[in-house]
């Protein structure tokens, strides 16, 4: 089979089971475990860091990949979704899986499914392709990102070494539950039999969910509470300074402690946004468990790039691409923009999937008086046209007078550029966000290589 044919078949599996089968979640999980066994349990004895969380999974996995690769290890990384190529999801030593290997391991999985009259969905077969590939490559460490939730996720068929949870907030509530308790329970479901769990959020619901699964956990925000985070607004980087807790006079305030003892170690993150410090702390803690030096950690960070995470696509005009796609990620995106621009200096171009809380997301953007273009994602799963989003906003009684509805994202971008170039224009930057698919579509129309998305 050829790669185009295989990718078409894989993407058509999005219509099969749609993440959750008609069976109960537990039954589907048992089916996935059966398939995993039939595939001879790839990566069974590997060192695996399993990463769950509402936001920040991809950044955390990439921090780990960069650091451990710089330390001389062979590293594998599985993330989702991709932006330009399906192969982006499956990396070994920072190199994408080849088309030939996608075809090879697709055929292995399909042979098992056909012989046992089993069906699985898009994400599930992608997970099994990745695990088979990682087994063949014999990587030292595997960094495995969940697709949705954790407890019943396809990635949870493996026995991981360390569980990592970035954070918990509201997203996919129809599938994960409508409370933080329920969502946290799903995320904490990746923890295996009392194994070490490292997480990065001071949230009681998450702390309680973790404690139900293990007595062996580290909240890095508490462990490294003496932390200073600054933004390098000239180079779009984040500066993190970690201060040791020992030998400090508890009667002094935190600033006095930092200045007096100067015990900090400074790291420069290539990703912009104070929230990235939380993701980095998880990677830092895991790196220290395996004895990786601070110098190697920084070397690994220096060699990292990650598309769609406050990505500077253009400097003239300033164009920022960000995959923020839910309440929490849009909130932190706005916080980062506040460090660079005034509220009325930014033009947003975005589209949002129909599965998201559209009203809440737009309220966070509209309250800042940004100019907004809404575009169409009608051609992707769960995507909406600009007019459909308009109806959603009107039904939520959200004013749309500062919004331009333009289905074509390239036309929206050209109009936004014209607004910036006008004489005495107040606008200084364009931000494209709302979905991985929005970023993919934008890059496609701007001449970047694109395959199925």
Spans of model-derived segments:
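Short functional linear segments
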Residues: 1-53, 60-62, 66-71, 78, ...
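ATP-dependent carboxylate-amine ligase catalytic core
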Residues: 20-26, 36-44, 70-158, 170, ...
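Hydrophobic alpha-helical packing residues
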Residues: 64-69, 134, 365, 393
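Nucleotide phosphate-binding/pyrophosphate-handling subdomain across enzymes
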Residues: 136, 141-146, 153-164, 168-172, ...
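Conserved catalytic-core segment of NTP-binding enzymes
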Residues: 150-151, 159-213
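Beta-strand->loop->alpha-helix junctions that form or flank phosphate-binding loops
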Residues: 198-201, 213-234, 269-274, 296-303, ...
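C-terminal helical cap/extension that packs against the catalytic core
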Residues: 203-213, 318-319, 362-429
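Glycine/aspartate-rich loop-and-adjacent alpha/beta segment that forms the canonical ThDP
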Residues: 435-453
């Amino acid at each position: 089979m050829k790669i185009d044919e295989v990718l078409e078949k894989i993407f058509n599996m999005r219509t099969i089971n749609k993440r959750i089968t008609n069976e109960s979640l537990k039954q589907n999980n048992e089916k996935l475990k059966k398939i995993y066994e039939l595939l001879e349990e790839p990566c069974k004895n590997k060192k695996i860091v399993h990463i769950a969380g509402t936001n920040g999974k991809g950044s955390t996995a990439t921090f780990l990949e960069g650091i451990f690769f710089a330390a001389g290890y062979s590293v594998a990384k599985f993330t989702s979704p991709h932006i330009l190529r399906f192969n982006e999801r499956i990396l070994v030593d920072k190199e994408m899986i080849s088309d030939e290997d996608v075809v090879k391991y697709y055929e292995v999985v399909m042979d098992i499914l056909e012989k046992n009259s089993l069906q699985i969905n898009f994400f599930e077969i992608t997970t099994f392709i990745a695990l088979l590939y990682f087994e063949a490559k014999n990587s030292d460490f595997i960094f495995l990102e969940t697709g949705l939730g954790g407890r019943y996720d396809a990635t949870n068929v493996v026995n991981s070494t360390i569980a990592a949870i970035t954070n918990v907030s509201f997203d996919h509530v129809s599938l994960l539950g409508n409370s933080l308790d329920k969502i946290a329970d799903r995320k904490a479901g990746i923890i295996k039999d009392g194994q070490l769990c490292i997480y990065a959020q001071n949230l009681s619901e998450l702390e309680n969910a973790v404690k139900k699964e293990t007595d062996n956990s580290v909240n890095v925000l508490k462990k490294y509470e003496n932390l200073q985070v600054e933004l390098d607004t000239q180079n779009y980087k984040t500066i993190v300074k970690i201060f040791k807790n020992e030998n400090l006079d508890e009667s002094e305030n935190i600033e006095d402690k930092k200045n007096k003892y100067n015990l900090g170690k400074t790291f420069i993150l290539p990703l912009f946004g104070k929230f990235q410090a939380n993701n980095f702390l998880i990677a830092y803690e895991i790196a220290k468990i395996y004895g990786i030096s601070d110098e190697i950690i920084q070397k690994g960070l220096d060699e990292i790039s990650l598309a769609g995470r406050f990505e500077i696509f253009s400097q003239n005009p300033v164009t920022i691409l960000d995959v923020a796609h839910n309440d929490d990620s849009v909130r932190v995106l706005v916080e980062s923009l506040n460090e660079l621009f005034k509220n009325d200096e930014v033009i947003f171009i975005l589209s949002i999937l129909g599965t998201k809380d559209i009203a809440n997301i737009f309220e966070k953007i509209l309250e800042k008086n940004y100019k907004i273009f809404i575009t169409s994602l009608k051609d992707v799963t769960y995507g909406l046209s600009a007019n459909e989003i308009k109806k959603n906003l009107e039904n939520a009684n959200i004013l749309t007078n500062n919004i331009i509805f333009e289905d074509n994202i390239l036309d929206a971008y050209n109009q936004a550029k014209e607004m910036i170039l006008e004489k005495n224009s107040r606008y200084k930057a364009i931000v494209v966000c709302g979905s991985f698919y929005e970023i993919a579509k934008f890059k496609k129309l701007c001449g970047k290589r694109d395959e199925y998305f």
